[in-house]
């Protein structure tokens, strides 16, 4: 959807090439809607201050849990650059919040059959707990998909006319060609340039301040996530001509479903490269002699993953006790692997589902209730040492 008012948008935030920094206009006096929103969110701020612990070493991920409509100065863990962008672009922060929820859902989908299943912690402003403190391949995946989620959400919001500072991609103009022949750029191409630019400015801001080995790792994986979204842009076209002869085509670029990005990054996780920082701290080298060097599309990590089989609060592992597993599967969702050899309990449960649905004119669908009894298998907890005093 191409929104009117392009000249006004250009005045607020000129669209430049992807390498250009995100321009920041001088803050204007808040209008009535913004002022009322700030007043209405004072209650949310109070709740935030009451529920969060005193330590606020966290990240922008919490925006997805809080929602973007918060007072930017009081979101824990934002660095000054992120606060500036939050204050000046509150509508984009709404997209950042939506993107955070989207990538967390995707992370949980990708690892639903894994010992570590991307569990978020309620009332924990770090979102994932201590597990992200380790520079593991799980941390590499989370940073990559979080960056990708922001790009995807902002890009989509631009072309749907939800943001005042961007609209359709201004670079897809004129004639072009592909394997099928020539076509004209038209319609509303998704503005991936703006999405990547803003995501880089906002998400990378904290890591660019720190400038240590972990920050270097995070920046690399953030870039992998942004690149993954761009990788799956697709060309959509409409034919023009007599009886659909397609003598002329009008085409535009569109985002693919975020699942494709998630699937790709999961494959990158499986092939992630263990590295170590060079002495000058400016690059990576292979962690051990004989290991392959990381490329720009590889996820990288420093540390081996903790043992996710057992509860380990210090490492952030929740263990697999109580996790549902498949008795017949030989994969990571199978009881043998998921339960780490501890065995499993079986519970017989009755599930009620709708079945034999029929359409009745007009206009209703009526279904019967069907009851199915199934066996649910859950992992046993680790046995306590026999020498421990049980009294």
From Swiss-Prot:
Q: What is its main location?
A: secreted
Kindly state one GO CC term assigned in the UniProt record: extracellular region
Which Pfam families does the protein's record reference? wnt (PF00110)
The disulfide bridges present are 107-118, 158-166, 168-188, 237-251, 239-246, 309-340, 325-335, 339-379, 355-370, 357-367, 362-363
A GO term, aspect molecular function: frizzled binding
Q: Which residues are glycosylated?
A: 117, 283
* Tissue specificity comment: Isoform 1 is expressed in adult heart, brain, placenta, lung, prostate, testis, ovary, small intestine and colon. In the adult brain, it is mainly found in the caudate nucleus, subthalamic nucleus and thalamus. Also detected in fetal brain, lung and kidney. Isoform 2 is expressed in fetal brain, fetal lung, fetal kidney, caudate nucleus, testis and cancer cell lines.
Maturation and modification:
Palmitoleoylation is required for efficient binding to frizzled receptors. Depalmitoleoylation leads to Wnt signaling pathway inhibition.
Q: Which GO terms describe its biological process?
A: canonical Wnt signaling pathway; cell fate commitment; cellular response to starvation; chondrocyte differentiation; cornea development in camera-type eye; forebrain regionalization; hematopoietic stem cell proliferation; iris morphogenesis
Q: Where does the record place the O-palmitoleoyl serine lipid attachment?
A: 243
Write out the entry's keywords from A to Z: Developmental protein, Disease variant, Disulfide bond, Extracellular matrix, Glycoprotein, Lipoprotein, Secreted, Signal, Wnt signaling pathway
Q: Which family does it belong to?
A: Belongs to the Wnt family.
Q: What does this protein do?
A: Ligand for members of the frizzled family of seven transmembrane receptors. Functions in the canonical Wnt/beta-catenin signaling pathway. Plays a redundant role in embryonic lung development.
As annotated, the protein's associated disorder is: Diarrhea 9: An autosomal recessive form of chronic diarrhea characterized by neonatal-onset of osmotic diarrhea that is not substrate specific, abnormal crypt and villus architecture, and significant fat malabsorption evidenced by high levels of fecal fat.
**What's the name of the protein?**
Protein Wnt-2b
* Organism, scientific name: Homo sapiens
């Amino acid at each position: 959807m191409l929104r009117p008012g392009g000249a006004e948008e250009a005045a607020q935030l000129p669209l430049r090439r992807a390498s250009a920094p995100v321009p920041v206009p001088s803050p204007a006096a808040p209008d009535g809607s913004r002022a009322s929103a700030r007043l209405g969110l004072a209650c949310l701020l109070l709740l935030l201050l009451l529920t969060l612990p005193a330590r606020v070493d966290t990240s922008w991920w919490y925006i997805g849990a809080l929602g973007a409509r918060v007072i930017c100065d009081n979101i824990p863990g934002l660095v000054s650059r992120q606060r500036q962008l939050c204050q000046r672009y509150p509508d984009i922060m709404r997209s950042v919040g939506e993107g955070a929820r989207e990538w967390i859902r995707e992370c949980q989908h990708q690892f639903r059959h894994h010992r570590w299943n991307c569990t978020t912690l309620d009332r924990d402003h770090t979102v994932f707990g201590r597990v992200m403190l380790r520079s593991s391949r799980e941390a590499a995946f989370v940073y990559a998909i979080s960056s990708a989620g922001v790009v995807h959400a902002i890009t989509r919001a631009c072309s749907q006319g939800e943001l005042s500072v961007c609209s359709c991609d201004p670079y897809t103009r004129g004639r072009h060609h592909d394997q099928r022949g020539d076509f004209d750029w038209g319609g509303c191409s998704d503005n991936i340039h703006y999405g990547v630019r803003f995501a880089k400015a906002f998400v990378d801001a904290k890591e660019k301040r720190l400038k240590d080995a972990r920050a270097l790792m995070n920046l690399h994986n953030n870039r992998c996530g942004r690149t993954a979204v761009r990788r799956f842009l697709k060309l959509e076209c409409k034919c023009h001509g007599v009886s659909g002869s397609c003598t002329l085509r009008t085409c535009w670029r569109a985002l693919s479903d975020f699942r494709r990005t998630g699937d790709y990054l999961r494959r990158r996780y499986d092939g992630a490269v263990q590295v170590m920082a060079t002495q000058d701290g400016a690059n990576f080298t292979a962690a051990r002699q004989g290991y392959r060097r990381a490329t720009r599309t590889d996820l990288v990590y420093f540390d081996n993953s903790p043992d996710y089989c057992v509860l380990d609060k210090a490492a952030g592992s929740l263990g697999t006790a109580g996790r549902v597993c498949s008795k017949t599967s030989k994969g990571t969702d199978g009881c043998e692997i998921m339960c780490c050899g501890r065995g499993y309990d079986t519970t017989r449960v009755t599930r009620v589902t709708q079945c034999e649905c029929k359409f009745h004119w007009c206009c209703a669908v009526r279904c019967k209730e069907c009851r199915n009894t199934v066996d649910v298998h859950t992992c046993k907890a680790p046995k306590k040492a026999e020498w421990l005093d049980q009294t």
